[in-house]
A protein has these predicted regions:
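N-terminal membrane topogenic signal
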Residues: 1-17
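Hydrophobic core of alpha-helical transmembrane segments in multi-pass integral membrane proteins
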Residues: 12-29, 48-51, 150-156
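Central hydrophobic cores of alpha-helical transmembrane segments in multi-pass inner-membrane proteins
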Residues: 22-23, 44-56, 72-79
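Short, hydrophobic transmembrane alpha-helix segments
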Residues: 24-38, 55-61, 84
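Membrane-interface helix termini and inter-helical loops of multi-pass transporters
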Residues: 31, 159-168
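Loop-to-helix transition at the N-terminal end of transmembrane alpha-helices
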Residues: 33-48, 63-74
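Intramembrane catalytic core of multi-pass membrane enzymes that act on lipidic substrates
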Residues: 58, 62-163
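Conserved small/polar residues in nucleotide/adenosyl-binding loops
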Residues: 171-173
Length: 173
């Protein structure tokens, strides 16, 4: 395992595996919940974050969470689009703009990230406290609060794609 995390390719494979596992386990956890719409998305998003938090703690590296900001919203937006009554063209306009943002950030992360030995210096600083404060900073400051910020930021896409009376024409965009 140590040799795997020393290379960029091995580290990327592990992070990808962790994301697939977290998304799938979050799906399994939430699939039988009797929640609708945004609340279901929120519970799924938080569940996936907590699973990534566990993987981050296994590696003692919170930078595993870094691409979560822009990778986790991708299945969320496609899930929302699947619920949409907008035309394919209107959905494509919204999804294209979103994907441009998400893929651009993911590509930039990919270019600049070295491997699982690299942890953002800000995370290290936030965790350079006593163990309890470090845990609180890691769980809330590095993982959960950013997830909630991203979740709130996705709400306009949710409203756009799920509103029945929304007139999404090129003039409005």
């Amino acid at each position: 395992m140590q040799n795997l995390i020393k290379t960029k390719q091995g580290s990327l494979a592990l992070v990808l595996l962790y994301y697939v596992i977290s998304f799938y386990l979050a799906y399994l956890f939430t699939k039988n919940f009797y929640l609708d719409g945004w609340l279901l998305i929120l519970v799924w998003h938080i569940t996936a974050t907590l699973i990534i938090f566990l993987f981050s703690n296994i590696h003692k590296n919170s930078s595993i969470y870094d691409p979560f900001w822009h990778v986790a919203p991708i299945p969320i937006v496609f899930y929302i689009a699947n619920q949409s009554s907008l035309s394919n063209l209107e959905q494509s306009l919204v999804i294209s703009a979103f994907l441009f943002w998400a893929l651009r950030l993911t590509y930039n992360w990919f270019l600049n990230w070295t491997n699982l030995d690299h942890e953002d210096f800000r995370y290290i600083d936030l965790k350079n406290n006593n163990k309890l404060l470090a845990f609180i900073n890691d769980l809330f400051g590095i993982h959960l609060i950013p997830t909630l910020i991203v979740n709130i930021s996705l709400y306009p896409i949710y409203i756009t794609l799920t509103s029945e009376n929304l007139n999404l024409s090129l003039i409005h965009i």
